[in-house]
Regions:
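Right-hand nucleic-acid polymerase module
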Residues: 1-160, 170-318
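Cys/His-coordinated zinc-finger cores
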Residues: 166
């Protein structure tokens, strides 16, 4: 039987992070956005289903009020879950057709002033395009998913630390045969692509799946896609630096795909078979005093939370 406490655990964790980041205060200059951020995740409703054959229970998220702001830990987590599921589906399809291994590549650039972040992002993007056109890259890499992160753990005030986290799908036979690219070579290739007069920090490592159950691969997918700025780094930012970061990254793409990871589409998410699963009821929860608490009815939930807008949630994001 499904445990609702366990299901709510991750929502609780990320809602608490959202409270700590306090986007409502960060966007105090934008009243409407501040209100949406402040209410994000304060309401959840789940549909409860029962398996007619086994009596097992399952809950699916039916509606909620999410802000969808990129700095929000709750919304970033949900976006990561959705995209990670899609990427995993694509990688499994690639594995069925090719003998592949996966690499986790991190590419950096010298820290720019925060006021130059937008220009630096564009410069890195162009450099990465050059890297993908290199014959060694084209010969070995079947596909990639690339994500950008804007700050590091110890980025100085007034600076940015844009860097890429990338999962590479490589031809296992050729890459680990005669076409292996060492970390020193990856560093050289990235330095050339950047046209840099310094040696950038580059890290490359093999992702090893334990017992073919994707444990490490799943971890790498989440590491790559998790967020563009760690929540605790956002907390450290001054209001002035946050506004500049928000301005510099407006409209910037967080994720990019290439090769087979772009061309092979994820399979549709499985849905509950209505012949097998019976709808039982809808359960309502409000975030009160640091945790989600159940409400007896939808009316009670609305009265307590003063919800102005609720969003239907697709099965892929449950």
């Amino acid at each position: 039987m499904e445990n609702i406490t366990e299901k709510l655990e991750n929502f609780n964790k990320h809602k608490k992070l959202s409270v700590k980041v306090n986007l409502k205060q960060r966007y105090k200059h934008n009243k409407k956005k501040a209100e949406v951020c402040g209410e994000c995740g304060s309401f959840l409703s789940f549909d409860l289903w029962r398996n007619k054959e086994t009596n097992d229970e399952k809950r699916t998220l039916e509606s909620a009020n999410f802000c969808k702001v990129k700095w929000c830990p709750m919304c970033a987590w949900r976006k990561t879950r959705k995209l990670a599921g899609e990427i995993k589906s694509t990688l499994e399809q690639i594995e069925a057709q090719y003998k592949v291994r996966y690499l986790f590549l991190t590419l950096t650039i010298k820290n720019p002033p925060l006021t130059e972040l937008r220009n630096t992002i564009k410069y890195m993007s162009n450099a990465f395009k050059l890297l993908t056109k290199n014959k060694l890259f084209k010969k070995n890499v079947l596909g990639y998913i690339r994500a950008i992160e804007y700050l590091g753990d110890e980025t100085k005030s007034g600076e940015a630390h844009p860097h890429y986290h990338i999962i590479l799908a490589v031809n296992a036979t050729s890459y680990f045969g005669g076409n292996y690219i060492s970390q020193a070579k990856w560093t050289e290739l990235w330095k050339q692509a950047l046209k840099a007069d310094y040696t950038p920090i580059v890290d490359i490592r093999t992702i090893r799946a334990k017992n073919e159950k994707w444990k490490d691969s799943d971890s790498a997918i989440f590491e790559t896609l998790k967020y563009c700025v760690a929540p605790l780094e956002l907390v450290k930012l001054s209001q002035e630096n946050f506004k500049e970061l928000d301005k510099q990254t407006k409209g910037a793409r967080q994720y990019n795909k290439g090769g087979l990871i772009k061309t092979i589409k994820p399979l549709p998410n499985a849905t509950l078979d209505p012949e097998l699963w019976e709808y039982m009821k809808t359960e309502y929860f409000n975030f009160v005093n640091g945790e989600y608490k159940k409400c007896a009815t939808k009316k009670e939930a609305d009265q307590k939370n003063h919800i102005k807008q609720k969003q239907k949630v697709s099965d892929s994001q449950n």
